Amino acid sequence: MSEPALNPNITTQELMAIDYHYNYTEKELLADWVKLKNVSEFKTGSQFKPGMKLCQHYFPNFWNIKSSGGTSFADCWQNYELMDKVRLWGKQGMSQLWLSWVRRAVFMAGGLPNSSFYRPHFSRQVILNTGKDEGILFDPCAGWGGRMLGTVSAGWHYIACEPNVETYNNLNNLIDFLGIRNSVTLYNIPAESFDYKSQGKVDVVLTSPPYFNLEVYTTDSNQSYHKHNTFDIWVSNWLEPLINNCVSMLRDDGLSVWNVMNFNNCHLATSVIDIHNKLNYNCKYTLGFQSPIANIRTVKNKDLTYVFAK
């Protein structure tokens, strides 16, 4: 069910009283799961997002992500001056005010990072491209469930780490709702605590790592950006060892898949590419919204999923 238009004469206080969370019925959520499981042709438009309703519904703590300055979307929604500005923007620029637009405007007005859910169909697409009916995918940074949904929808087993207790619990709630417990192994630990040597081989590693301190998910000391105080130190002491450990788990024909981009003065995509190249893994293709590999060095500031192989 699409969200209704807002009252064109809504006041700022009335706008602030609206529940900005995504809320779907059980029927809508199950239909979205079926839609994801049936996808075999993958569109590149931003409105193509099977399975996303499940992520949006089950992770309300998404709105508590803080910027490096310590402000979250939830904080902004309670800021009268900011919300009044957003309301006036909408009234001046649009004939109809929609909650979806208001959410985007709050991110912009609040100077927040453009946080997003990983599209479940991207992980499904990676798996279907392997041609394997069965396999194991490891995700060192589980996050909001998108990679889990795509993996299980394709018939593979999903193994992941998630240090944030609230996110871990929400993942388990989603697992129980869909009845996919036998297809998921989830650890409430940071990626660096995972026992890579004992795990055995996997077919694909797929993750979207923290963008250093661009998004602060929790004040928990287990978060990697609390342990390494500069981007370069974080890359050397956390990201590169993580990639090395993940690649060590791969079968000979395995794929190392990373959703990253460069941001501010932090060359995250460049670092991920360079680390893989040192391990003799090269980028074979990318996934994203109309993202050709031809100009890989000029698109690394875009949010892409890079697929590396030997």
Where do the protein language model's features map onto the residues?
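Class I S-adenosyl-L-methionine-dependent methyltransferase catalytic core
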Residues: 1-53, 60-76, 82-310
